[in-house]
Each structure stands twice: as structure tokens, then as C-alpha cells.
Amino acid sequence: MAKIERFYDTFQPEHYDVYVDVDRAKKTIVGETTITGTATQSEISVNQKYLVIDEVIADGKPVEFKTDNDAEAVRITLPNEGKVELRIKYHTDLTDTLMGIYPSYYELNGKKQQIIGTQFETTFARQAFPCVDEPEAKATFSLAIKFDEKPGETILANMPEDHEAGGIHYFEPTVKMSTYLVAFAFGDLQSKLTTTDSGVKVGVFATKAHKADELDFALDIAKRAIEFYEDFYQTPYPLPHSWQLALPDFSAGAMENWGLITYREAYLLLDPNNTPLDTKELVATVITHELAHQWFGDLVTMKWWDDLWLNESFANMMEYVSVDALNPEWNVWELFQMSDVPAALNRDATDGVQSVHVAVNNPAEIDSLFDGAIVYAKGARMLVMVRALIGDKALREGLKNYFAAHKFGNSTGADLWKALGDASGINVGEIMKSWLDQPGYPVVTASVNDAGQLVLKQQQFFIGGGEDKGRTWQIPLNGNYGTPQIMKGKKLNLGDYKALRTENGEPFRLNVGNNSHFIVQYDDKLLKDILQHADQLDPISKRQLLQDSQLLASAQRLSYADLIPLLVEFANDESVAVISVLYRIANSLKQFVIAESPEEQELREFFGNLSRKQVKRLDWTPKATDSNDDQLVRPYVLNASLYAHDAVSIAQAHELFEDNDDDLTQIPAAVRGLVLKNEVLNFSSKGLFDKLMKAYHETVDPSFKQDICMAVPNVTDPELVKSLVNDFENADVIKPQDLRAWYRGVLANEESQQFAWDWIRNEWSWLEATVGGDMEFATFITVTANVFHTPERLAEFNAFFDPKVDTPGLTREIKMDKKLITGKVDLVEKEKTAVNDAVAKEV
């Protein structure tokens, strides 16, 4: 297994002059990179991948070199150590891998067009130009770009253009930065521009296939977010401009290239007249996430990839801090509780999960660090925990000092904890060590013992079994009975329960606000007290009660059947924080029934009972008077009514479809996906299938594309399913960036599942060649494991993935997902009778 060499140890670049000549028609790249730096020995290496090195010149004289493709390097022999100017000439192909320099395709007026963009994180700058491609190897960069330019085309880069001469566009030198943040793009683009109060130019760029007003929302959010961050961080934005660019083909969600942030179109552009609130919230949080990186990740960067969480966890928290300040009426912290928190709690409960801080020993493992549920979601939750501990005043002061101390340089987690600790007077590093370096999280049991004492105990929580290694965490308890701020040991006695209950006058609860990364299991006495006063709980506390209960049931620490009465209790709550988790639990009940069985029929009736009052209250037509919660709750209850085969819902959705049959984009976007799903489920035909796939191909509206992607995989006609699966490998129909969503949709449909499962097994080599370098490649395995829950599928999963378990970057995912499916199989076997009996009692 290849080990990672640190080329920075022997060669420290200071400045790059990067010349690149891109010919789109010939699909070629010719380049020349001049690196000024210091060699600490005569034998040095710089990174390259897929580059053909033509010549290496050191201080004006050709020198010996050897290309080492296994190490993604070019080995160079210098006359002596010390200051050196390296000039490296090379050429390579322009490929469609979505990494390095690559073309991005779209249609305009029926003709296929392309723009060129870049994606260099994690280690893909080396596919564009020779460099020391390590985060610590910060340098300045002067870009000179030539391309087969057509009149009216736009070229963008990290810094403003200085001048153009001989068809070459020369850009101002960058500030000191890491290679993975270098970016440029060119093509036929439209834009909208503004300027912040402090003078930073802000722009949004997209292809001309989009309507101009689709750029407006992003421009407003970006401008206000930069102004917010400059104030919150008390540190100026360090560059002259901040460009936001939507690329038609993009592997990640977005990328924080300094001064030129790139996005999937779905995460930047939206129709201001017909976009649901949840999509606006999503786009806003993606933009503010990337802009948070301009300081945290770009200005100050982790030394090595094992501290990736420093970048991503912090940006993940700050996206909510900023959007909450920009649009407080959205209550966006509820979105955090609905997305990041459950993602972290579920993933982090599987034995074998990575810790937030994890060592990297193999180049192929770097991309596997981007575990969204851990590095992003759990890490953000850790920082939310810290914020709650120290408060915003200390947080802002600590960050100001942190940026001042490390700007244009690198840092570690210890540097951040020190800055926050100095500002708050709290030893943040000591508290956070257990959360950063240990995988998993604790369940805290709260019980009244025989002596009447209220006792807390902590132990690691597992779903699907796990090896208890006696881990403990320093837990911010956030109790409502004056509990200690931090629980350090395995056991804590809080005193006489009766006296505490009388003194406090309310049920005992821990983790109030749900900011700390643990769950609580109350004994029967304490839980009964909470449920008797459930109407006094705020939405987050109700959500927390439901969420913790499901996790405990999934771990078989309580019966899954005990969740059924809780669903009935909270079914008519009007908060999306509650309803979203309620239907998450309700949908999980489907694993306990066989399709079209009497048990499933009873489950459908149960869904009808849960959703009936809410459907009547909200119906299928969004109204101007809808509250934010109404807008967000509606899709959950309408989807439930469709599963219930509710005749009124089916008819109303069908009517909306027919009323807009000539232009499906005019269906209210808040319900459009469900309207289309209803057609596929209940009025399916080849004509409908062809109509929707044609619309998918022709539209540039990302929201409409997602609605079609949600609906079409519900098709059951075998010939239509075959046709759809065949298009998985046709990039003109389904772009590789969107393939996972289509695969998941077909796999989740029991009647078409076999087609998708056969496809991924038969076409694994194609999938690996197409998206194998993508940081989300392993999530195709995750998606599969999230769907499977039967012994037969577990056996097939093991048979296919066991031989791949030693593949770098896939090992952890395969091992964890085997445990995940095994746990579900065991749960269903043990609980299905009790669950189905409990459902039957409610119908």
C-alpha cells in the first residue's frame, strides 16, 4: 500500500507562475509552470498526475527528472540545494472526470455548449500543473490562461485580470494560499454584480441557458453574508472580489476556491417566483458555508488533511449562524436539528465509524475523510456545543485572535482550542479532546434508584452492536435541575429525586436545546413524567424526544413498538421540527412489512390516520397566508397521504397535474415533486415516462430536475425501468453528478430494486472509472446499505463487497455498512410482530 510522502519537507515553494493553454476543440492542455522556492536537498519531488513532463529546467539549465506515476510525482535532481527556480513544461488531455481542469456541458437553443472549470480539492491541482500539492505548501500564484477564445466569452480566476496580451489573460498575483484553492473558469457566461459596504466586489455567474433573475437570490445572500462575516469575525475579507460560479457539471455540492467559489447549479440558482422555502434555505446555507471558508479554510488552512474538520465543521456551523442572522424568520437552527443532527447521530452510532480527527496514511484515503455525517455534521455539532459553553462574545474574540495569529498560514485543532480557551477562560481543548479523537458518542441513562437517588451513567451508544471499549466523554449536560456543567466520569449522582422534582417544579431533562452530542435514556418513571407534560415542550424538545426514542429502539434498548403511540401523540403538531422526525420514524416502519401484505395495508391506514387532519388543514394548494412551518410541513403530510392511498389526495394531485399539463414547471414548486410522483404511481404510462424524461433533459431549472428525479424512479413497468437504468451511463441524459440520486430512487422502489442492484454489480468497473476519484464515490455503498434490510440482500451485499474490502478509501465504508444492514436484519426479525401488532391497534 502506497504511503504518503510529504514533498514540502524537501522543497518549499514561494511563488508559482502558471501558464496554461486549453484547446477545447482538440481536448488538449499545454502548460508551463515556473516555481520559485527553496530545496533542502538536491533530490526533490513535485506532484503531477496524468501530466506528460516534457522538460525540467532549474535556474536556466535542463536537469534530470523521472516521472513516478505511482507516487503522482516527478523526481528532480538539482545541482545543489538552496534557492531555485524550476521551469516545468508539460502537456496532457482535457478529460471529463470533473477533476483538475475539465469541460462542463449544457445546451443552449438546442446546441451542446461547454464551459471550462476546475476542481482541485483534495489532490487534483497536480492534474492541472506541477506543484507541491499539500495544504501546508502555501505560496502565491500568478495565472496566465490562454484558450480557444470566442467573442464575448468571460474568463474568471481567484484574482482580478491584470491585462491581456497575445490572447493570454494575465491575472494579478494571489495572496499566499494552498494549491487546492487555485481556480479559473471560462466560457459564455452571464453575470450580476454588486459591492459590499466595505468595497468587496460580489458577482454571480452562470451559463446563458438560465434566466437572469435566477441569479438574484444568490447575489443578495452572498453580499449580506460577506458583510456579516466581516463583522462577526472582526477580520476583513482579504481579496478584492468574491465570484460565485454555477457549473453545469460539478462533482461536489460547492467548492470554496478563494475568490472564485464554484457550485452545482442546484445550489446557487433558483427561480424567485416558484421555489419552495426549503430550497431557498438549502441554497442560502450552501452559499454561506462556502463564504465562511474564505476565512476558515482559505485565510487559515489546516496543516494536513487529518485536520480537515477544522475547515468543514466550522463552515458547517457558521452557515447556520449566518443565515439565522440574515433571515431570522426562517428559524434555520431547526433545519440544523432536522439535517445535521440526525445524520451525525445515526452514522456515529455504527461501530467502526471514523473519529472527527483521523490519521491519513494512504493517498486514496484522503477523499474518504469527507464523511459528511462526521467531519461536517458531527464536527459542527461539537462546535455548536463549544459555542453554547463559551458564548458568542468569547467565540468572536477567540476567532479574531485566531485569524490574526495564523492568517495566510496553517493551523491545527490545538491552535483553535487555545484561542477560544484564552478568550473564554475555559479549557476548551481538554473538554473537546474526547469528542475529537474518539469515534462514537454516549448514551446517558437517567434513573431513580431504589434509594430514591437520581443517577446518571454514560456509556458508548451503538446501533447494530459494537465493542464497548470503556470510552468516556466530557459531556456538557445542559440539564434543567442545576446539573454540573460537565459530566466527566462514568457515573454521577445528582441527589434525592423527590426533593429535586419539588424544588424545580418540572420534569427532569438533560441536553435541553439538544446542542450536545449525546442522547438520553430515561427510566420509566422519568419518561412518564415528561410525556404527561409533553404539551409544555418546545418543538426542539419534542423532536429530541422522538429522535432519541427511535435511536434507542434501533439499538434494541427499547421496543420499536413503543414508538407507535408517540407518533399518534404528536401527529397533529404544526412544527416541521416535530413532523419531519415523526415521518422519518413512520417511514422506518415500512421495513417491518412485506409489500402488498395485510400488514402493509394496515400500515397504509395508519399513515392515513396520522396525516388526515394535517392534509385537510393544509391541502395541496400553497397559500400566501401559510406560515413557514406550514410550507415545510405540507410535503411530509401529503407524501404520507399518497402512501395511504388517500383517494382525495390522489385526485387533487392529479387535478394539479392536468391543469398544468402543457407546462409542468407552473405547478407550485412546493408540491410539484409529489404531484409528479402521484402521476407515476397512479396514472403511469409510457407517454408519461417519456414526457418527464424529455422535460428532465430540456429544463435547466435545478429544482424541477430534482422533482422529476424524485418522481420517475417510482415507475414499475419493467420495460420502463430497464430504459431508465440504461440511461444511468448516458451522460447526455443523467449527468454523473446526479447519478447517485437516480440510483437511490430506483433501488428504494421494491418493484424495481433488482434492476438497480444488478446494475451496480454488473457496472461497478464503469462506475469506478467514471466517479471513482470523486469524494462521494463510497456513498454509493452507503446508499445501498441504507435501503437494504433483509437477510437475502445482506448475503448479496456481503458477496459483492467483501472482495473489495481492502480497496483504499472503501474499507471503512464496507465494514460499517455490513454492520448497518446486519443490525436492521436483526431488528426486523425480533420486532416485526410487535410493531405490526402495535400498528394494527391504531387502525
Give residue ranges: language-model regions.
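Short, well-ordered beta-strand segments enriched in hydrophobic/aromatic residues
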Residues: 29-37, 453-458
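Surface-exposed beta-strand/loop patches in extracellular or lumenal glycoproteins
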Residues: 34-51, 133, 142-148, 461-476
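A surface-exposed beta-strand-loop module
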Residues: 48-107, 129-130, 496-503
